[in-house]
UniProtKB/Swiss-Prot annotation:
Highest taxon of the lineage: Eukaryota
Organism: Candida albicans (strain SC5314 / ATCC MYA-2876)
Pfam families per UniProt: AWS, SET, SRI, WW
Protein name, UniProt field: Histone-lysine N-methyltransferase, H3 lysine-36 specific
Similarity field: Belongs to the class V-like SAM-binding methyltransferase superfamily. Histone-lysine methyltransferase family. SET2 subfamily.
Upper classification of the organism: Eukaryota, Fungi, Dikarya, Ascomycota, Saccharomycotina
Length: 844
C-alpha cells in the first residue's frame, strides 16, 4: 500500500474506453484478523481537542519570521463561529409497522439533508427518530474483508455486491491539527514507517489512521477507482465516508483516488495497473492529474474534467509559471471558467453541496458568483433557501469576517478558511460580501425561523460594525441596514424548542465523538422523546411554585382527547400540547378537547409571561392553521386504516367459510380489486428451498401441527415475536435492493409493497421450518448477515416472485374494461382453491 497522505478524493471519472475489466479476488485468503494486529481498532474518531473536526470553528494561521535563522513559524488561532442549530430536513416520519422501522429520508426520498451530505440527528428533525439517513451514526458498513495484494500490501475487497453510491466505510482515526500533522509526518519518516494514513478533513484538521483507525485504512489508491471519499456533517462534527462510485462486484478490490497532497511525502510508484495510471504519487512535483478538480466541485462550477484536461494541455506553460506551489487545484483554470446561471434544482443541490464542503477561497468565490448570477429567478431562490442556504451563507460570512480581522492583526495570513493565499485583499473581500448581501436581499423570507436558526441577524450586525470601524464601505452599510430592517418585521412561526447539542469535552472526545456517533444508541420511546425536550414545570425549584404549576397543568390536561398531555414552556410562558402516540405537538388545545373553565386571576408574577405570550400571538395563529391541517390528515389516515382492517377481517372470514385458503395473506391490492383476473397457482410461497406439495393445506393442518408438535421448547410467545421481528429486519436489509431494478416497470409504490410482502413471506417460511437465526460471536448471539448460499436462494425466489407479479401486473392493464366482473371471478377461484398466492401488488 502506498503512502496514504491524501485529502478528499477527487471522484474524477475516467473515460469509459479506458476502464478495464475489474479483477476479482474470490479465492483470496482472508487476512482481516492478521491485519487487525497491525493497528488499534477504533469504532469512532478521537479528537485532539474540541476545535479540530468541528463544523463550528474556523482556524486562522499567521506567519512570523525569526530574524536569527530566517525561518518562519506558524501560530494558529481557533475562533468559534456562532452556534447554529442542527441542519434539519423537511421529511415526515414514515413508520412501517411490519418492518418496525422508520423509512423516512431513504435514498429515493429527495431528503434535503441526504442530498447536501448532512446526516439527520434524532430529536432534531421532523422526520422522526432512527430515519434512513443515519449511516455514519449507525455504522452501516458494507461487508468487506482484508487480503494480501502482490505489490500494494494489504487491500480491501467486497464480500458482497455493493451498489452505486452505497456507503462502504467511514475513514476513522485520530483527528489532529496541522501542527501535530506536520510533526507526525517527520516522526513517522524517522521511524522509517513505509505507510502513512493521513486524510485532510479541513484546512486545519487531519485524520491520522496510522496507528489507530478502522478497516477503511486498508483501501488502496487507483487512478481509475471504483469508490470515492465524501465529507459529511454529522451533528457538530465533520466526518469522512467512503462510497461506491459505481457498482462493485463481490471479490473486487475497493479503491479510491488519494489525490495526494505535498507535505514532504516521498514520491512513490503507483501499482494500480490502470491504463490511465499516472505512474507516481506524491513527491515535490505534483502531476496535472492530481490537481484536477473533484467531480463534485467541477459539476457545481458547471465544467467537466475533460474541459479541464483540454485547458491544461493548451496552457501548461502558463500553469507552471503562475500556479501556487501550495495549492491543490489548477487555480488558473478555475479563474478562466466563465460562470453561468443555475437553471434547475439539480444545479442548486450541486452548488449548495459543494459550498458546504469546500474551504478553498477561490472555489467559494466562484460558487457565490454563480448564485449571484441566478438571483433574478424566484424559483431558484426558493430552492437555495430550502437547501440550507441561510446557514451556509452565515458560515461563509463569518469566515470572511474572521479573515478580515486576522489580516489587521498581522501583516500576513496563511491557510485560513477564507484567506489571502490567492492574493485577495480587503477590497476583494468587500466585493464578495456585497455579492452575498445582495443574494440575501433577493431570497424570499416569509418567516424569521430559518434566518434566526442561522444567526444571520447577528452576523450581518457584526459585518456592519466591522465595516464602520474600518473602511466604511457605503454599499455594505446600506445593504446591512436594508436587510436588518426587513428581517425585523418578520414573525417567528413558532416551533417547540429543539434539544440543544451537548458540547463534546476533551475527555469524551478522546474516546468517541458523541453518544450518537458511536452508533450504539437505541431509539427512545415516545415517553422518552417527550421528556427529553419538555421544559421543567415552572421557572423555579421551590415546592410552592412547582405545586402551583402542577395544579395548572392538571387542570389543562382535564378534557384532552386520549393520549394528549400538556406541558409548560418556560421560554415563552405558555403551555403546549403533545400526543404520546403520534408525537404531534401544538400550541393550541387539540381538536376534540373540552373547553377550559374560567382562567384564574393573574398575579404580578405572570405579567411578563403574558406579555411575552402576546408578542408571538400572530405567529401562533399561523402555527395553529398548520397543526389543524396535520390533525385532519392524521384523522383521515386513521379512518382509512380502520376501514382497511375491517375489509381484511371480512375477507378472512369469507375465506374460512369457503374453506379454500391457499395459505397466503390477503393483500390490500386484493381487497381493492386492482389485480388481474387470470393466473395459475404457480406462485407457492411456503418456502424458498423447493416446492411444498402440501402448500394448499397449510392452514388446514396448522392447528394440528401446533397441538402435536414438540413441546420441549422453552421459547415463549414474546420471544417468538422477537425472532419474527429479527427475521423481518434481516430480510428487509436485502429484499429492497434485490427487487429495486423492477421500479422502472411497476413504480416505486408497487416495488415497496412487493418488498414488504416478500419480507413477510420469507419470515413466515423461516419460522414455519424452525430455522435458527444466523449465528454470530456478538453479544446478541445472532448476525444480520446471511450466508452466500442462502442469499442466492432468496434472490432466485424473489426474482421468480417478481416475474409472476410482472405478468399479472401487465395483464391487469389489458383487462381494465373487465374489472367489474372481478368479484365473481375471484369468488370462483377461491371456491376452487386456485389462488394467486399473494403475488398481486398494486398501489392502494
Amino acid at each position: 500500500m502506498s503512502n496514504n497522505n491524501f485529502q478528499e478524493s477527487s471522484n474524477n471519472t475516467s473515460s469509459p474506453s479506458k476502464r478495464s475489466t475489474p479483477m476479482l479476488f474470490l479465492d483470496a485468503e482472508n487476512k482481516t484478523q492478521e491485519a487487525l494486529t497491525t493497528f488499534e481498532l477504533l469504532n469512532a474518531c478521537t479528537y485532539q481537542n474540541k476545535y479540530v473536526g468541528s463544523a463550528n470553528v474556523t482556524t486562522t494561521a499567521t506567519t512570523s519570521t525569526k530574524t536569527s535563522n530566517s525561518t518562519s513559524t506558524k501560530s494558529h488561532q481557533q475562533q468559534h463561529r456562532r452556534k447554529l442549530e442542527y441542519m434539519t430536513c423537511d421529511c415526515e416520519e414514515e413508520w412501517d409497522s411490519e418492518l418496525q422501522m422508520n423509512l423516512a429520508c431513504g435514498p429515493d426520498s429527495n431528503c434535503i439533508n441526504r442530498i447536501t451530505c448532512v446526516e439527520c440527528v434524532n430529536r432534531n428533525c421532523l422526520c422522526g427518530d432512527d430515519c434512513q439517513n443515519q449511516r455514519f451514526q449507525n455504522r452501516q458498513y458494507s461487508k468487506v474483508k482484508v487480503i494480501q495484494t502482490e505489490l500494494k500490501g494489504y487491500g480491501l475487497i467486497a464480500e458482497q455486491d455493493i451498489e452505486e453510491n452505497q456507503f462502504i466505510y467511514e475513514y476513522i482515526g485520530e483527528v489532529i491539527d496541522e501542527i501535530s500533522f506536520r510533526q507526525r509526518m517527520i516522526e513517522y519518516d524517522l521511524r522509517h514507517l513505509k505507510h502513512f494514513y493521513f486524510m485532510m478533513l479541513s484546512n486545519d484538521s487531519f485524520i491520522d489512521a496510522t496507528e489507530k483507525g478502522s478497516l477503511g485504512r486498508f483501501i488502496n489508491h487507483s487512478c481509475n477507482p471504483n469508490a470515492f471519499v465524501d465529507k459529511w456533517h454529522v451533528g457538530d462534527r465533520l466526518r469522512m465516508g467512503i462510497f461506491a462510485k459505481r457498482k462493485i462486484s463481490r471479490g473486487e478490490e475497493i479503491t479510491f483516488d488519494y489525490n495526494v497532497d505535498r507535505y514532504g511525502a516521498q514520491s512513490q510508484p503507483c501499482y494500480c495497473g490502470e491504463p490511465n495510471c499516472i505512474k507516481f504519487m506524491g513527491g515535490k512535483t505534483q502531476t496535472d492529474a492530481a490537481l484536477l478538480l473533484p467531480q463534485m466541485i467541477a459539476e457545481a462550477l458547471g465544467v467537466t474534467p475533460r474541459q479541464e484536461k483540454a485547458w491544461l494541455k493548451e496552457n501548461k506553460s502558463i500553469r507552471n509559471q503562475q500556479q501556487n506551489d501550495e495549492s491543490n487545484i489548477n487555480e488558473e483554470f478555475v479563474n478562466s471558467i466563465e460562470i453561468e446561471p443555475i437553471e434547475n434544482q439539480d444545479g442548486v443541490t450541486k452548488v449548495m453541496s459543494a459550498l458546504m464542503k469546500t474551504q478553498h477561497p477561490l472555489i467559494i468565490k466562484k460558487l457565490i458568483e454563480r448564485i449571484f448570477l441566478s438571483n433574478d429567478q424566484d424559483d431558484i431562490n426558493v430552492m437555495f433557501v430550502r437547501f440550507h442556504g441561510y446557514k451556509t451563507i452565515s458560515t461563509i460570512l463569518q469566515d470572511l469576517l474572521v479573515a478580515k480581522n486576522s489580516g489587521k492583526e498581522s501583516e500576513t495570513t496563511d491557510n485560513n478558511d477564507i484567506d489571502n493565499s490567492t492574493g485577495d485583499d480587503d477590497q476583494d473581500k468587500d466585493e464578495l460580501i456585497i455579492k452575498i448581501l445582495k443574494i440575501l436581499v433577493s431570497w424570499p423570507a416569509v418567516t424569521k425561523n430559518k434566518i434566526a436558526s442561522a444567526n444571520l441577524e447577528e452576523v450581518v450586525k457584526d459585518i456592519q460594525t466591522n465595516n464602520e470601524n474600518s473602511n466604511n464601505n457605503d454599499e455594505i452599510n446600506q445593504l446591512c441596514t436594508s436587510l436588518l430592517d426587513r428581517w425585523s418585521k418578520l414573525e417567528m412561526a413558532y416551533r417547540i424548542p429543539k434539544q440543544e447539542s451537548v458540547p463534546t469535552n476533551n475527555a469524551a472526545a478522546a474516546a468517541t465523538t458523541t453518544a450518537t456517533a458511536t452508533g450504539t444508541t437505541t431509539s427512545a420511546s415516545p415517553f422518552e422523546r417527550i421528556s427529553s425536550h419538555t421544559p421543567e414545570v415552572g421557572g423555579t425549584n421551590t415546592p410552592s411554585s412547582t405545586s402551583q404549576q402542577q395544579q395548572q397543568q392538571n387542570s389543562r390536561d382535564a378534557g384532552l382527547p386520549e393520549n394528549w398531555r400538556s406541558a409548560f414552556d418556560k421560554n415563552t410562558g405558555g403551555y403546549y400540547y403533545y400526543n404520546l402516540v403520534t408525537k404531534e405537538t401544538t400550541w393550541e388545545r387539540p381538536l376534540g378537547s373540552l373547553p377550559l373553565g374560567p382562567k384564574p386571576p393573574s398575579g404580578p408574577g405572570l405579567k411578563g409571561r403574558i406579555n411575552k405570550y402576546n408578542e408571538i400571538d400572530l405567529a401562533k395563529r399561523e402555527e395553529l392553521r398548520i397543526q389543524k391541517e396535520k390533525e385532519m390528515k392524521f384523522i383521515e389516515m386513521q379512518n382509512r386504516d380502520r376501514k382497511l382492517k375491517e375489509l381484511i377481517e371480512m375477507s378472512k372470514k369469507s375465506m374460512n367459510n369457503i374453506g379454500g385458503s391457499s395459505g397466503t395473506t390477503i393483500t390490500a391490492a386484493t381487497i381493492n380489486g386492482l389485480s388481474d383476473n387470470g393466473g395459475n397457482n404457480n406462485g407457492n410461497i411456503t418456502g424458498i428451498y423447493g416446492d411444498d406439495k402440501h402448500s394448499k393445506h397449510h392452514h388446514h393442518h396448522h392447528d394440528k401441527h401446533l397441538k402435536n408438535g414438540p413441546r420441549n421448547t422453552s421459547t415463549s410467545s414474546s420471544s417468538g415475536n422477537n425472532v419474527e421481528k429479527i427475521w423481518k429486519r434481516i430480510f428487509a436489509k436485502y429484499i429492497p435492493n434485490i427487487i429495486k431494478k423492477y421500479e422502472s416497470e411497476i413504480g416505486r409504490d408497487n416495488v415497496k409493497g412487493c418488498a414488504k410482502e416478500l419480507v413477510n413471506i420469507l419470515t413466515q417460511s423461516e419460522i414455519k421450518h424452525g430455522n435458527s437465526l444466523p449465528s454470530s460471536s456478538s453479544s446478541n448471539g445472532y448476525s444480520m448477515e446471511l450466508s452466500d448460499k442462502k442469499l442466492k436462494k432468496i434472490k432466485e425466489y424473489s426474482h421468480g416472485y417478481m416475474d409472476k407479479f410482472l405478468i399479472k401486473f401487465n395483464n391487469s392493464k389489458k383487462h381494465k374494461s373487465t374489472m367489474g366482473s372481478k368479484g365473481s371471478d375471484n369468488h370462483k377461484r377461491k371456491h376452487n382453491g386456485d389462488g394467486d398466492n399473494g403475488v398481486k401488488r398494486s398501489k392502494v
